[in-house]
Amino acid sequence: MKRRLLLSSISTSAIALGALQLTGCATQNIADYAAEKPVLDLRQYFNGTLDAYGVFTDRSGKVVKRFTVLMLCSWTGTPGEETGVLDEDFTYSDGTKQKRVWKLQRSVDGSYVGRADDVVGIANGQERGNAFQWGYTLNLPVDDKVYEVQFDDWMYLMTDKVMLNKATMSKFGIKLGEVTLSFTKR
């Protein structure tokens, strides 16, 4: 009986480990979007005033927060060394407000680094075709605590005025939820 329980426990653990390995391999690759149109240039899209509408869903898919964002965006500098400022004002459905100011730096190779007060270290991103992918760690306030959570953030240009954004939030590799946004350029 003990041997059967031990084997059952080992089998269950092996299946769980295998499932984790498979899900770890099933990620998007920015290169997959290289031929997609319209071609995204962050400097052009995030320039001027934008409105965004979004939801945060928990890991079960339930909407737990709705919000809007007003963004004022600008770029300065010479080609290959541009610096962008994305000034975001969030308003949540419960009436709370939040501000985040991204400072972006574009490299000659087309990659980006970004900083914001609530981002731990730097965000790294790259664009290909109609897509942009960011990876970063965010200090997320929940009640009276702040948690460091990781974001795998993907944006897809749909038209010259509309971009969709889907970001997966995780901690210790465990998915906590997703943020889905629609940006509209004025």
Describe the role of every protein-language-model region.
Residues 3-7:
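N-terminal export leaders
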Residues 31, 75, 92, 153, ...:
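Sequence-level preference for short, compositionally simple segments enriched
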Residues 33-49:
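N-terminal helix-cap/turn-to-beta initiation motif at the start of protein domains
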Residues 63-70, 146-151, 175-177:
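Amphipathic hydrophobic-ligand
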Residues 152-186:
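Glycine-rich, aromatic-bearing surface loops/beta-hairpins
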